[in-house]
Amino acid sequence: MKKTYMIVHELDVNKGGMTTAMLTRSKVFLDNKIEGNLVTFDYKVNYHDILKKLIDSKKMDKRTKMFNAFSYFKESSNKKHRRNNQTITKMLSQLMKNSVEIKENDSISRFFNDKSGDYLIYRRQMNEEVIFDLFENNKRIKRLYFYYDKLHKIDIFNYKNELTAEQFYDNYGYLYIYRQINTSNGNIGNTYLINDKKHFKNNVEFCAYFLEQLIEDNNDNVMICDGPGSFPKMLETNHKKAKKFAVIHTNHYKNFDNSGAVKKKEDYILRNANKINGVIVLTEAQRKDIVKDYKMKNVYVISNFINITENYRLTNSNNIVGHVSRLVPQKGLTYLIEVAEKVVEKNKKIEFHLYGNGEERKKIENLIHEKKLNDNVKLLGYTDNVTEKIKEFGCVVSTSQVEGQGLSIIEAMLLKKPVIAFDVKYGPSDFIRDKENGYLIDNKNIEEMSKKILKVLDDKKLGNELGEKGRETIIELYNSKKLIQKWEDLFKE
């Protein structure tokens, strides 16, 4: 049985397209008797809760296993110890015993030495986690983290209040990882794995060692690196028989400015593609550009798996223009507000509902206010129920300036929503047939996009026809049987 290990820096509940793609791929793999494991490298004390939420929300299959570097070595350390190490907790208790507590509220307290008056401890509680900042000469020197009353981490600071090191503790209170932090750039430096008596010069070496311990080097094991920042860690391992692939989920070109410049992480992957078994992209157009620019042979096209939703009755009667994405520059949301302005000028009954969060939220809020669109353009934040929100829309728009595939557009088409999108690399032109199952608009043509929105919302029959054909297209293009066969063929090469 093939075992795949899909590698990414982290998992969380409110993650977007790439996480969704990995979780869906894992489920399809498992349905086809291929293990679909996930591998992460970040530190989260509450990963158990995160995985439960992902499973409860149906985003993650309950059969999917996740292996995390810290959890892996913590569990190993737990097996070596049976008695609790109370050294640090006793020290903290003694410090608090000889002090005066002044409460700011139920969650925050400060402790002062009852004789010298020195400021000793700042304590704050956040749900199940309690954090203690320890002070000497009025400067923070350590931060202790407790989760359900168990010490799990200590941060160490210098006299400038800069983080210099992190210590990680197992369930019995024993140190299992110590790592130094470069104060000038925040990079992880020397890392020490206590029970294995191992020293690593940097985080890449440490994570590569974790992969080597986790994944047996045989022909049945396959590593699939989805997170571009995690690629150097996979590349560093000494595996000879286990296969290695990298998936590029986005446009590899930089700043969508047509300069030909390539993003640093994606460029590193492509320049080192000869050292792995292959690079996978989501569209044929991207594959052709990469072959042309990098003279590569081992680049393959396999689209993301799509959850084929059940066929349901059309409800395209709403005057709601929908958009689901992160609020980041590459999504072209300033153009979307310009489109909204022109549409609302013609029909004040039309509303734009934008779901998602991100760094541009304040900028978009200000733009909405400046253009006096508060009654018609709603920023509704992150939703964990995208399907139900899309069902409310009369049509869906995309002003994105760069795409890897466009999962939210695909989901909208599956739900029979007419889609109007800027024609950008890569994605929309792979599945939108202009005037047949949606509309492809020349990039940044605000006037034309506005006209098409008004046309679709005014002519419900047209909107329903586009929606029906859109669903047919997606089901034909993204058939799971076709895609799983591509993966299986790749594993055999």
Give residue ranges: language-model regions.
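A short, active-site helix/loop in glycosyltransferases that binds the activated sugar's phosphate group
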Residues: 273-298
